[in-house]
Amino acid sequence: MSTSSVLKLGLPAGSLQEATAELFRKAGFEITFASRSYYPAIDDKELHCTLIRAQEMPRYVENGSLDCGLTGHDWIQENDAKVIELAELIYSKVSRRPVQWVLAVPIDSPIRGPKDLAGKRIATELVEYTRRWLAGHGVSAKVEFSWGATEVKPPRLADAIVEVTETGSSLRANNLRIVGEPLLTSTPRFVTNATAYADPWKKRKMDDLVLMLRGAMAAEGKVGLKLNVRRADMDRVLAVLKEHPKTSLNAPTVSPLTDPDWVALETIIDEDIVRHIMPQLYAAGARGIFEYAINKIIE
């Protein structure tokens, strides 16, 4: 196979690795990780995967070592990388909420805002972005790279930290408090470079891949619902559906049955309302109600 028919895809190693593999599985791609290998197998001969830390992904995509990859908005900013963002994919190791980079200090610290950081030592993995943030506030402070366990460094090893958090639980567990608003809010992004995206075959492959990933994300937390209803009861059944804003992409699909007095109705709903809406539909006259899983929704 020629290299022009292979898309070099970077997958984030570390905390997002399993969540990324699960997203790809829902999109129709099976990724298999082998012990000590940084080249996971995928059931698509046109994709060649490489495991790379999300922190480094932007520069490898930017310089063409990889055609595309998944990384965080934070690492694009940290590397000041010139990449093309094809999609925002909101997922993480814990939830589908964005992560935030925050300034945190010990609970009893006198630091209350950026100006109080003058001359202080700050530990973070987001060094360059933090320096730019401080400069924007006209503050001069010492920013040191942290290799990990950043939460334990104040107050002995650092006066403050800039750390990523999803729930804030780790910061609270280490007796730290957040100062002010987040420095940066970040979500995963699917990125490429201008050269790869100018290649018609690679562009089509990436666009198709992004479409399927978005479809998998759109289907998360949703299920399909089918039911039969007498035409005479249709208004009551539709009224139940209209009471729940989490039903259907547009409007339920109605199909005739062999019995002219009955129709089949199909809709998409949020999974968390199934237990509420099914009894209501039954009471309104619906019969033969069943729920089914949805893997992808492409609008």
Model-derived regions, located:
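Short, structured active-site "lid" loops
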Residues: E46-D67
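Small-molecule-sensing regulatory modules
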Residues: S2-E46, L51, T71-Q100, D108-E299
